[in-house]
Amino acid sequence: MKPVYWLLPGLLLGIPTFAQSVPEPPSVAAAELGTDLRYLSNCLQQGQFAAVDSLLATQSREQREYLLLQLLRNINVTRPASPELHAWVAAQADKAPRWLVEQRVDGFLVQQPAYDFAAQARLLLGQWQQLAWQADYRQQLEQGTFGFKSIYYRGNPELARQQEALLQALEQLPVSLLQRESRTLAAQNIYLPDNRLLSYLLQRTGEPALYSRLWRQPVDQDALAALATINSFHQGNEASELLIAASTNPHLKEPALRQLSALSPLPQQARSYLLGELANRQYGSLVADLLMEVDEPLLLSALAKRLGQHDQNPMTPTLFPDSGTPERRPGL
């Protein structure tokens, strides 16, 4: 395999860059390098980083980058790294792979690393950072010192990754601590980029105050999943109040009405609300269909009376004031 020396900028810099005009990345026979790889892995496990670097320096550029990639892939990321291993991996992340191959992308030939060990090193560093955040958050949560505002603020470039670490930390806590954190979060006016945190806590605790916070958020699939948990944690008047409150959000109104009508027995508050919604020009037909499925004679009688009035007198805003729901049914 003969490398091609690029004169510029390679010779000017004194470090030639290698490339090959082949459609597939070059293949180094793994069997030939297996002994070296096992030796390198053993040295790495024992913290002998100088020995690792010395052996790699004796290899050809292609073999060195291949071995580096395999070595980094074999590192265990299920536990935090030692400071020395972290520093060694960070040093690899700062290097630029120089054994390149040409590949056709969208009709153009582009040069790409054959063995991108630097990208693998950056991946390891990111995974270790996640573990470190997770451990810190768990300790703070257990001690009652965690502050949601330390993560949730506008402009935080690490918000998505830190939220993922927080959710992993919460997964390891008992329900009693989750209930405490749910009440703390409900009392705070902080920025939330989505409803993942609210949905997770509600699916574990059913904290009523947290539902109220959720109804004020933009609706997404996590909000719908959290709405569905109400009937699992609450019954009777409490469930009725939560679902009626949810129905004030136009994007939650239809699923909230469906859940409300499914309460059994149906609380008086829910009956009155649903009968009142018959006058809603947007949702009246849906509510009528839902009420006809309810096995309660008194409610069915009231429904028949309302529908009879509707047949005799066309529904108008004067007879049946609109509940204030928008004219168009929004999509979920």
Label the model's feature ranges.
Residues 136-142, 146-173, 180-204, 212-233, ...:
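Structural detector for internal amphipathic alpha-helices that build alpha-solenoid repeat scaffolds
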Residues 22-170, 181, 306:
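N-terminal Sec/ER secretory leader and immediately downstream segment
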Residues 44-48, 60-64, 194, 205-210, ...:
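Short, solvent-exposed helix-helix connector turns and helix-capping sites enriched
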